[in-house]
């Protein structure tokens, strides 16, 4: 029975939408998971009477409180503008290129990124080279193109993150599009002043084995403009963004105005009283209650001209885009003695409400 009780609590926690108000059941489910308990402990008043919270426990609790107000975790982010950034090849080797894009002031203020597309121009392969390749490697006519985001760290080392990878035919030529939205999301998380956006383009064999070594060498991307001097072959980075002045949320709700269907997406303040919950009695020492928030209201939907361009995006909804943790002091009974313990429940309080679409990319957090 206790196991079934825990399963129910965690199931209820998983069903909660990011736009709904935080409930006592969610707090309980997270606490049970954090403390690895099957059910809430039953503590008598005598167990906690006269208990003094040590200064180091109080200090830890206050530090977590301060950190929760400064540290935020991002949830789903969603960003009619199209901007192209010309890139240049910094390094060109047999099968690896490093593209450099100057990004400062390229993203409009008060906007969010919907999609970033890298366009590379694949040069046609001379017919003589194709005939020779077919004679030497008849079963290999494709190569794998991989896009990675490259980051140089302060200590001089570098890290890469896989962004996109696909097979291209040596018999094709023209513009090839790669989705590099995640790379731009990573770049946005860098501290200022930000380094340029670095994208590493690698051309490799489709698979290992004899007779496949030469095909990938025939795949080449234009590094400069076409012979007519118009620069049409240069690598291009397209940035698709939405103006949040029209499509974003408004911040905190007006406490004097009732929330209706026409209310623009906002963060509504609420108070969760833990003292009034039976399961928290004699177990939750701090806080007795706290301010919590929910995301309410509606969002302006995209016009048909944009939904047809981005068919992967669903209806826009008012959701929590940034969450923060909730520190607590609880009573823990061990060996007949009761002591206070600090726990921190992640993603419990809404910090920011935003308008987002189903299907929008959820960015990965940038690792140190």
Swiss-Prot record:
GO BP annotation list: anterior/posterior axis specification; cell migration involved in gastrulation; cell population proliferation; determination of left/right symmetry; heart morphogenesis; negative regulation of cell population proliferation; negative regulation of nodal receptor complex assembly; negative regulation of nodal signaling pathway
InterPro entries assigned to the protein according to its UniProt record, in alphabetical order: Cystine-knot_cytokine (IPR029034), LRDF (IPR003942), TGF-b_C (IPR001839), TGF-b_propeptide (IPR001111), TGF-beta-rel (IPR015615), TGFb_CS (IPR017948)
GO CC field: extracellular region; extracellular space
Location in or out of the cell: Secreted
Signal peptide bounds: 1-21
UniProt-listed Pfam families: TGF_beta (PF00019), TGFb_propeptide (PF00688)
Glycosylation, residue list: 158
Biological function: Required for left-right axis determination as a regulator of LEFTY2 and NODAL.
Protein name as catalogued: Left-right determination factor 1
Organism encoding this protein: Mus musculus
Name of the gene: Lefty1
């Amino acid at each position: 029975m206790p196991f079934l009780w825990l399963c129910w609590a965690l199931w209820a926690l998983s069903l909660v939408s990011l736009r709904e108000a935080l409930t006592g059941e969610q707090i309980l489910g997270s606490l049970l998971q954090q403390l690895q308990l099957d059910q809430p402990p039953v503590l008598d008043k005598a167990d906690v009477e006269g208990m003094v919270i040590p200064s180091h426990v109080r200090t830890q609790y206050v530090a977590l409180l301060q950190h929760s107000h400064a540290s935020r975790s991002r949830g789903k982010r969603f960003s009619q503008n199209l901007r192209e950034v010309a890139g240049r090849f910094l390094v060109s080797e047999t099968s690896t290129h490093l593209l450099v894009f100057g990004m400062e002031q390229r993203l409009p203020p008060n906007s969010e990124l919907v999609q970033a597309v890298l366009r590379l121009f694949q040069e046609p392969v001379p017919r003589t080279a194709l005939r020779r390749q077919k004679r030497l490697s008849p079963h290999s006519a494709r190569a794998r193109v991989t896009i990675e985001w490259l980051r140089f760290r302060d200590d001089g080392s570098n890290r890469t993150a896989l962004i996109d990878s696909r097979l291209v035919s040596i018999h094709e030529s023209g513009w090839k599009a790669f989705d590099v939205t995640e790379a731009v999301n990573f770049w946005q998380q860098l501290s200022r002043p930000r380094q340029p956006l670095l994208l590493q383009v690698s051309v490799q064999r489709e698979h290992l084995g004899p007779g496949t070594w030469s095909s990938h060498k025939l795949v080449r991307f234009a590094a400069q403009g076409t012979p007519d001097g118009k620069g049409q072959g240069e690598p291009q980075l397209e940035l698709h963004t939405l103006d949040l002045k029209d499509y974003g949320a408004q911040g905190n709700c007006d406490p004097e105005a009732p929330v209706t269907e026409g209310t623009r997406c906002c963060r509504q303040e609420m108070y969760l009283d833990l003292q009034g919950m039976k399961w928290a009695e004699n177990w939750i020492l701090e806080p007795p209650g706290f301010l919590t928030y929910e995301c309410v209201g509606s969002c302006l939907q995209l016009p048909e001209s944009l939904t047809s361009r981005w068919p992967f995006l669903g209806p826009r909804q008012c959701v929590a885009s940034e969450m923060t943790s909730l520190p607590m002091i609880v009573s823990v009974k061990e060996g007949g003695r009761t002591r206070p313990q600090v726990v921190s429940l992640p993603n419990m309080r809404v910090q920011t409400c935003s308008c987002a679409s189903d299907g929008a990319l959820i960015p990965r957090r940038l690792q140190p």
